[in-house]
Amino acid sequence: MVTTLLVAVVLLALIFDFINGFHDSANSIATVVSTKVLTPFQAVLWAAAFNFLAFFLIKDHKVANTVAKTVHENFITMHVVMAGLIAAIAWNLVTWWFGIPSSSSHTLIGGFAGAGMTNAIFMGVNPLTAVNTHEILRIAAYIVLAPLIGLVIAYVITIIILHLFKNSRPAVAERWFKAVQLVSSAALSFAHGGNDAQKVMGIIYVALVASNVITQGQHMPDWIPLACYSAIAAGTMSGGWKIVKTMGSKITKVTPLEGVSAETAGAITLFMTERLGIPVSTTHTITGSIIGVGLTKRVSAVRWGVTINLIWAWIITIPISALVAAAVFAIIHYL
């Protein structure tokens, strides 16, 4: 049954999706802006277009299915979904304000799981029974693996490109790579849209199940993907300039050649994990790729102080969003 609460939760989910877009737009445009291939305004329009293009080409929704299964059905209520979304939105806004490229994906999953576990406590059962530990552990593993995969792929691609173009004139090579970077940034934006919009699709799906509008296992209504891809593309168009600065220059200085390597590595990693149905962080992935590029110069080319601060932000994202969601759920429960 469609209720005011369901409408409010769907709107909250789309607000989160929009915030995810402007929070994570930096991931897909940072290198193309820092190399001056596109202006910031051109870059966000470019990224938003390819975010939305994923709606037409990605139809399996494997990532959405994984997100929907992170909390067991009998522990999911509308208040659980609402608390998880409020926590995720709050942490995303905090990290955006301070220019910290944390993971919107893990914020959402942490909030959803934290609210579900708190509901289990109020039901008088072990909170761990509320979550699908297999899926949670799989997601947790890729918190580490996704940036490492991006790092290795970017390192290898950069070494290969440097070898192939070692005799080319620098000015000619730079012009060529600036053109190619339009393609690599488009691929990264497409992969970002395909991966991140699905996470919100999964949340809206479980909200509809909890409201008895649809049953578990029923086909996802067509309006959900359309709304989610539209929201993330609109958010991307609004930009996130604080994070662009961190991603595009504070980790390591990036040339057009290196931008192509980082974006290609990030896109490959995101395409691979999407096929596996694993909701990974675009932020973590592209950061690992940029570090991989920096390592081809020398270890000191990577600004490890900034990188370590980012890693700490990643580590605390799921626990903090889970705790905030637990507090929000408790407040809603007692109101």
State where each predicted segment sits.
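Multi-pass alpha-helical transmembrane bundle typical of ion/small-solute transporters
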Residues: 1-335
